C-alpha cells in the first residue's frame, strides 16, 4: 500500500503521521520506520518505531533518498511500513515531477518486498500529477 497525505503547512499532516506510526506499531506484524528531517517528532512517536533523521545524511536528490529506503529494507527484511514525513524537507531539491517518478519506483519496492509507504507532502493538491493523485487518501 502506498498512501499520500498532501496539503499545505498547517493542514494536519503531522498529527496524522504521528497517529499512523503509533497505530501501525500495534497493527503491523513487522517493523515500522519513520523518516523525518530533524528530531521534532521523537517525543510524539513510540520508541518501538525506528526513527531516522535525514539531517544525518547528505540527501541531494530523490535518487539518493530512494537509496536510503533500499538500504533500510535491505538491512531489515522485517520492515513492513515506512512513514515519510515532509518528503520535500528531507529532499529539498525535489519537485512534484521527481515525486511522480519516485512513486513508480516505490510501487516496485512495495511489490517486491511487501512494504507499505505513507508519505506526507507539503504542497497544494492541485500541483500533484496523476501518479501522486492515485495514492492521495
Protein language model annotation of sequence segments:
Residues 1, 30-31, 77-80, 115:
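Short coil/turn segments at beta-strand junctions that form active-site/ligand-binding loops
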Residues 1-4, 17, 100-102, 137:
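Gram-positive cell-envelope targeting signals
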Residues 2-72, 129-130:
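Conserved P-loop
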Amino acid at each position: 500500500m502506498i498512501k499520500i497525505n498532501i496539503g499545505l503547512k498547517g493542514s494536519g499532516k503531522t498529527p496524522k503521521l504521528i497517529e499512523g506510526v503509533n497505530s501501525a506499531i500495534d497493527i503491523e506484524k513487522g517493523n515500522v520506520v519513520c523518516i523525518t528531517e530533524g528530531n521534532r517528532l521523537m517525543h510524539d512517536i513510540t520508541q518501538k518505531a525506528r526513527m531516522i533523521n535525514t539531517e544525518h545524511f547528505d540527501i541531494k536528490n530523490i535518487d539518493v533518498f530512494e537509496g536510503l529506503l533500499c538500504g533500510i529494507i535491505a538491512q531489515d527484511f522485517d520492515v513492513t511500513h515506512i512513514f515519510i514525513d515532509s518528503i520535500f524537507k528531507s529532499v529539498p531539491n525535489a519537485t512534484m515531477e521527481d515525486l511522480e517518478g519516485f512513486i513508480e519506483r516505490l510501487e516496485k519496492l512495495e511489490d517486491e518486498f511487501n512494504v507499505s509507504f505513507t508519505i506526507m507532502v507539503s504542497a497544494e493538491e492541485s500541483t500533484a500529477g496523476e501518479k501522486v493523485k492515485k495514492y492521495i487518501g
